Amino acid sequence: MREPALAASAMAYHPFHAPRPADFPMSAFLAAAQPSFFPALALPPGALAKPLPDPGLAGAAAAAAAAAAAAEAGLHVSALGPHPPAAHLRSLKSLEPEDEVEDDPKVTLEAKELWDQFHKLGTEMVITKSGRRMFPPFKVRVSGLDKKAKYILLMDIVAADDCRYKFHNSRWMVAGKADPEMPKRMYIHPDSPATGEQWMAKPVAFHKLKLTNNISDKHGFTILNSMHKYQPRFHIVRANDILKLPYSTFRTYVFPETDFIAVTAYQNDKITQLKIDNNPFAKGFRDTGNGRREKRKQLTLPSLRLYEEHCKPERDGAESDASSCDPAPAREPPASPGSAPSPLRLHRTRADEKCAADSDPEPERLSEERAGPALGRSPGLDGGSPPRLTEPERARERRSPERGKEPAESGGDGPFGLRSLEKERAEARRKDDGRKEAGEGKEPGLAPLVVQTDSASPLGAGHLPGLAFSGHLHGQQFFGPLGAGQPLFLHPGQFAMGPGAFSAMGMGHLLASVAGGGGGGGGGGPGTATGLDAGGLGPAASAASTPAPFPFHLSQHMLASQGIPMPTFGGLFPYPYTYMAAAAAAASALPATSAAAAAAAAAGSLSRSHFLGSARPRLRFSPYQIPVTIPPSTSLLTTGLAAEGSKAAGSNSREPSPLPELALRKVGAPSRGALSPSGSAKEAASELQSIQRLVSGLENQRALSPGRESPK
């Protein structure tokens, strides 16, 4: 402390003097400049603006004391300098929030019974980084307030003790000393301030209060430590402005049954169940109720039981081909072209493929499906020849769309298969079945087409009002998801060409490369995982056993010579493998589609390098119409050419590549003139027989050189 300017040994005190008058004016200390220092003393701005008189005067301190006394008494201070005449000091009473009112607040806890249930078990409140609300919410009812006075209601949460807890042996026990306490935060009710009448009209709920363990929280949430016990507190403050809270009187109310332990995950299962049973926002976790989860569960229970019965052997490690596990209607959308989601959702698990398999599998089919995954093939989309169905079975499946189309089954141990006997049978009965069924199955023209790849001619005339690619396949479901029990519908006017379809003629191996491209090109479709396995060969065959006997120019010329405009290839097919396979299945099932079969078979010679190396558009057919009845003498492609030939040639045609005459004669591909509408069934049959001879020759070649691989 500085020595006083006038040292007097007889003085009993040493008054404090400022070093210079201008350095510390009195207004710097009093309410005129910093009212928070002296909230009870408010002077006019000009009252203490002048500095103290000469510091040598010993009466300066006395003058200051007199000024303080005068201010305390509410008197005018005239000795401190000039000031406006109306200026005066306000008394201490004038700074109180409002006049004294008589009130005696009473607070009761809402939902006390529920709080008691939680309290008996040891209430837990989950805290998260993003903040979590309390349940039960802190809700009270207030009475005894002054109706006209304004109140601020708020709450905070404080540590109940200085212990850390752990849940051990189904009970909470002390685990050590508490962690350092988090910064205190008060939660002011959003309606504050409000009159006592408004507060007493309804319960006061703090349901928006959020608990967090994020110590750097910027949202104003209450920060807590996990595994610590806390006690909520409720406060009533009579004030008409939130800014006056620091100088106001708090009335605090504590309810012991509301204490809880903060956790990051529920420890006590009984607490979890109690919250599920009572929290209206947790109805999705209940077994009974009106929530979406309950309805979904009720709908799926029967099918789940059925699925458990049929798929139990597979879950235990065995292979099961039972396929009567139909999915629940709420889980699988119907396969209508207009309402279902994107058709690219075709990647299926093994269990789903099992459910889509035939309901009465034969022993051969069982062995083939087991051998399928080992060769990188999909059992439902293979290129071999499947066993035939009897006529009643075909009729039954055609009548019931719920049974749907079973995917083409696996075609033997290799891509050619060991089914020569069945193939000969199929060839022998192909024409008879086609003639018998040409007039059958007259159904409405817009009925979904259930494709069956195992019969000679399962498609009636009414099934085929339009067999082509439509230009607006995006946004419609061409094929429904091939889930359990779902039919594979072909919508009229939308068709594709692919390898799995030629199973009835044993030509699946010719389209291995196309299958690989179609599988890999679906924009993340199913083939992304398997379509490019084994050097570009799709699920129809493995790399070690599939030759690609035709050159690239042959396939292009074949398609062009048959009147099918083939746009140049661009990388991979735009549609998943199943699009190509099932549509070509329908095409190959007709008796007079030998030209299309030859064209698509030649297209299969494309190797992986041609798909990946060229930057051209994709294989696509132009739309064309099919007459209502298909006489035996009419070819599928001739009708299409008559209906849409000009449009196809204008939009998608390309010049055919050069082709040796020998290759054309070997394949037996007819010229454009041979495809006139006057072509007879005899010519179609001869074309089909020539293709079959070619396939037989290829199979003999395959038997002679089994180790040859397809060119990379």
From Swiss-Prot:
Keywords: Developmental protein, DNA-binding, Nucleus, Phosphoprotein, Transcription, Transcription regulation. GO terms for biological process: aorta morphogenesis; apoptotic process; atrioventricular canal morphogenesis; cardiac jelly development; cardiac muscle cell myoblast differentiation; cardiac muscle tissue development; cellular senescence; cochlea morphogenesis. One of its GO terms (molecular function) is DNA-binding transcription repressor activity, RNA polymerase II-specific. Residues 517-601 are annotated as: Repression domain 1 (RD1). Residues 349-371, 390-408, 420-443 have a biased composition (Basic and acidic residues). InterPro entries: p53-like_TF_DNA-bd_sf (IPR008967), T-box_DNA-bd (IPR046360), T-box_sf (IPR036960), TBX2/3_TAD (IPR022582), TBX2_3_RD (IPR048387), TF_Brachyury (IPR002070), TF_T-box (IPR001699), TF_T-box_CS (IPR018186). Residues 109-287 bind DNA. The modification Phosphoserine is found at residues 336, 342, 359, 622, 653, 657, 676. Residues 313-449, 642-661, 666-688 are annotated as: Disordered. GO terms for cellular component: cytoplasm; nucleus; transcription regulator complex. Pfam families: T-box, TBX2-3_RD, TBX2-3_TAD. It is found in: Nucleus. SUPFAM superfamilies: p53-like transcription factors (SSF49417). Repression domain 1 (RD1) is involved in transcriptional repression. RD1 is necessary for its interaction with PML. Binds DNA as a monomer. Interacts with PML (isoform PML-2, isoform PML-3 and isoform PML-4). Transcription factor which acts as a transcriptional repressor. May also function as a transcriptional activator. Binds to the palindromic T site 5'-TTCACACCTAGGTGTGAA-3' DNA sequence, or a half-site, which are present in the regulatory region of several genes. Required for cardiac atrioventricular canal formation. May cooperate with NKX2.5 to negatively modulate expression of NPPA/ANF in the atrioventricular canal. May play a role as a positive regulator of TGFB2 expression, perhaps acting in concert with GATA4 in the developing outflow tract myocardium. This is T-box transcription factor TBX2. It comes from Canis lupus familiaris (Dog).
